[in-house]
Amino acid sequence: MPKNSKVVKRDLDDDVIESVKDLLSNEDSVEEVSKKSELIVDVQEEKDTDAEDGSEADDERPAWNSKLQYILAQVGFSVGLGNVWRFPYLCQKNGGGAYLLPYLILLLVIGIPLFFLELSVGQRIRRGSIGVWNYISPKLGGIGFASCVVCYFVALYYNVIIGWTLFYFSQSFQQPLPWDQCPLVKNASHTYVEPECEQSSATTYYWYREALDITSSISDSGGLNWKMTVCLLVAWVMVCLAMIKGIQSSGKIMYFSSLFPYVVLICFLIRSLLLNGSIDGIRHMFTPKLEMMLEPKVWREAATQVFFALGLGFGGVIAFSSYNKRDNNCHFDAVLVSFINFFTSVLATLVVFAVLGFKANIVNEKCISQNSEMILKLLKMGNISWDVIPHHINLSAVTVEDYRLVYDIIQKVKEEEFAVLHLNACQIEDELNKAVQGTGLAFIAFTEAMTHFPASPFWSVMFFLMLINLGLGSMFGTIEGIITPIVDTFKVRKEILTVICCLLAFCIGLIFVQRSGNYFVTMFDDYSATLPLLIVVILENIAVSFVYGIDKFIEDLTDMLGFAPSKYYYYMWKYISPLMLLTLLIASIVNMGLSPPGYNAWIKEKASEEFLSYPMWGMVVCFSLMVLAILPVPVVFIIRRCNLIDDSSGNLASVTYKRGRVLKEPVNLEGDDASLIHGKIPSEMSSPNFGKNIYRKQSGSPTLDTAPNGRYGIGYLMADMPDMPESDL
């Protein structure tokens, strides 16, 4: 038997027995053969794979310095601005405390299983989103490219929001705050309050006129807003510097950027609970309206929020988990991060409505004061008799309860004439029912509430610093979802790619810092991510469950984790989650079709918002954003299907595991005794596709066989050979 024959499984070819006997008879001890088998995997003794920490031989891929850094990175990515200004709005809009039940159910059915799936494939294959789905099936490689495109679209406008926050942060070091009062306009004859501000409010005026200097329509660009252009540049420089340093540096940044928001939220909660009206806000928030649970819209919006809250489909989850050790318990990570995300949303909701309750109380007191003055005027004019007013009530210093009593009495006495009196009920619930989300919550409602805080500049600095940290944490994950797949696939230098990516994003982002830029932010937010990400995650679920095979994936997880995942995930991934995602996709398409595409424009003359439809070119841009985001999926599929490029994925299929251990194809084995096992002698050229050409059929046959587990490489098969002395790997 020649020593350069290639080894196959014992039950596939009798040559294996002879080869092993030949090796053992060559004056080698069992220990020496064991060492040689170790060389198959590790190439060099000093690069041996550690079975305990799961590090990979010959793989210079960076790794997290600690498990805590990784968890904080995932938390920082998933917990973002949406937890602060989107979840409270949805909770208030969809039944208060009753909304939490649909959200929790959908978190268990869609959120955690799909989050676990993305963590698993990233850790399993140790590649970014492009490499992961190319590994599953080259025809599905477009899923990874689509994730990158969506990430880039989102990063373009998300960093603009961070730029806005930087502007407000820089303006917070003033006493009083610049949005505390309306500005005065002076001319030669007299001084008067700015009309646009007087008709709206000081914080609304500051946002639309001082910060954005907004135009009245998307068609009127108005030129660049230089203040926001500088802030956008600073935001991209911060992101670029953090990403150039790599995950070790960004991981250290995460200690601050991920933990600081919780410190601020807790401080805000404690401070706001000491203010009048805060309990009214929290009570209003969590008073359940159970009848709303029967509305399909509530479940659709809860599912959408779960979907985006965890960052599914962006590629950031996969990218971060690809730097993990092989035997990391990603199931624990999925559950932990998901519930941290949920409880963060609840904490933010408590803070938001405690603060809004305080604001509503102030507005309500002003309302009562103004209406009490109107009642006094009506009494003096004789429109209302003094006899109907209880004697113990002093309208000059009336309480909420007394005003309510007087209002009810007047309403009964003047039932027919009541409408013309123009009196307001002044109920705090009416103010709390004015649902506010997004920039309206952060830059208008919340800033107005903070002007009434003692030491308001301090709280303003803390609030906007918290938003900056939340935004940067999400941006790191979003950019990682772009950089990691491209670096893994095309082997470009990360530093150069990061600089190019950020510089290009800043240039494109100038669209968003025009005076009409806020309308483009709305456009990108509505159309660049929602449907494309849903399609991406549906395809991810299908790729793992049906293309790769759910049974095979469960086996991989068992090897990787050291225990078999619950059957619950089997049924979720194979049946329930795909069905729920398809339902959500259809519901989103229907909702988008029923809702006319448009935006809320700020009309200066009216000092109020007005809904406007997009012009025809705007419609084209909206449609193009959705098409461009998902276009890589069919393009790559067609290219692979028609064999327009090489369909080989051997370079992606060369890594596998056994009981959480890394097994990798050998390289550069000239002069190594272990090359005998591979049939490699110094005079032979190495196979260009090593992972696919190592399985020879019957002796003498030139035909090559990829074997049932050919994807895994020779290390996986050899580890299971009963007569081969198993190494410590």
Curated annotation (Swiss-Prot):
InterPro entries: B(0)AT2, Na/ntran_symport, Neutral_aa_SLC6, SNS_sf. Residues 42-61 are annotated as: Disordered. It catalyses: L-pipecolate(in) + Na(+)(in) = L-pipecolate(out) + Na(+)(out); L-leucine(in) + Na(+)(in) = L-leucine(out) + Na(+)(out); L-isoleucine(in) + Na(+)(in) = L-isoleucine(out) + Na(+)(out); L-methionine(in) + Na(+)(in) = L-methionine(out) + Na(+)(out). One of its GO terms (cellular component) is plasma membrane. It holds the Pfam family SNF. GO terms for molecular function: branched-chain amino acid:sodium symporter activity; neutral L-amino acid:sodium symporter activity; proline:sodium symporter activity. Glycans are attached at residues 187, 276, 383, 394. Disruption phenotype: Mice are viable and fertile and fail to demonstrate any striking abnormality in motor and sensory functions. Other transporters could help to compensate for loss of SLC6A15. PANTHER family: SODIUM-DEPENDENT NEUTRAL AMINO ACID TRANSPORTER B(0)AT2, SODIUM/CHLORIDE DEPENDENT TRANSPORTER. This is Sodium-dependent neutral amino acid transporter B(0)AT2. It comes from Mus musculus. The lineage of its organism: Eukaryota, Metazoa, Chordata, Craniata, Vertebrata.
